[in-house]
Amino acid sequence: PDFAQAHYNLGNTLKELGRLDEALASYTQAIALKPDYAKAHYNLGNTLKELERLDEALASHTQAIALKPDFAEAHTNLGITLQELGRLDEALASHTQAIALKPDYAEAHSNLGNTFKELGRFDDALASHTQAIALKPDLAQAHSNFGFTLHDLGKFEEAIQFFKKAIELNPNFATAHHNLSYTFLSYGMLKEGLNEYEWRWQTPKFNLQHRNFTYPMWDGKTTLKDKTVLLWCEQGIGDTMNWSSCLSIVTSRAKHIILECQKKLVPLLSRSFPNVEVKAENRSLDADRDDFDLHLPMGSLYKHFMDEIMENGMASSYLVPDPDRVKFWRERLNSLGNGPYIGISWKSSNMSVKRLPNYSSISQWSEILSIPDVTFINLQSKDFEDDLSKVREELGVTVHNFDDLDQW
């Protein structure tokens, strides 16, 4: 029981099996027995990162380096964690240090390329990925990372080839499949993209969100006419509302539909789909549930019903507002003056380094906000005060804000 290396090796095995909480316990025990065990601190950090406990991962990687300053692997994994935390300049320094310690370390060159990409330094990113592949041509991770950089540059055809090469080298490389799905979808190859999107559940981030039911996931083939199907939300509120466009199709196929969604959406979706039993998401009893025959995460709806959507068109106006609230807001907006009334939102409430390229600054809206005879309404949920003041001072335009408007 006091053999630190045995606990460490057990942790490695458990981590490989995806049993991350148990791996965590084994690494922790190894460290308790041997506090200066740098590799145990390092793999503890890697496991914490997979569990998205980033601050703790950072501490473990830092401790591994303190114990073993020439530990190149710890430096580059510290860099990965720093990048996840949005600390890109520090991440760059960590990857650079790893390469200084071990110049032929292909993985570190590839990780450096990822950080360059996030910084918008695409030429440097491509050079780093090229170097990684030159050092280790069979490194699937490097081909996948190269592909993702090309994707961000809009070079979809080239990106697809790099992802395919990564998958050829490692057919079960879930991250490459998942990244390929986004490129296929961006390139308009919907069927291929939706098929590859199913690999999301094998990636570390999504694997943590999967639900452990006794009953099976629908395979898209089994008839639903005598089945109760549980659909469950898996991502954000906007995603749930988007995927709800498929509910009328599923409802027409199944005996009964239970939809579990974010609590805030229950009134809206109950009103919009009266034939669906809408409930707030509750994962606490997953293993014991017996109120359905089959289940499906909502992100898989398009995969199974895309042919029908393409043939008949997308559902339109499928969300039904509360008529009393419609009347209330119509009167309130009319009191501001003439319309049209345009609600605007220019950034996510979940701004991260990875999401920054998808959003705009309020300054980029100047042409739109300068259009005459339009009344603009703020739909930004937080951190908007300075932006609205800037618009008022620089453009002389008031974007109206209602403090009592539920912005989600």
Label the model's feature ranges.
Residues 1-408:
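Alpha-helical solenoid repeat scaffolds of the TPR/TPR-like class and their adjacent stem/linker regions
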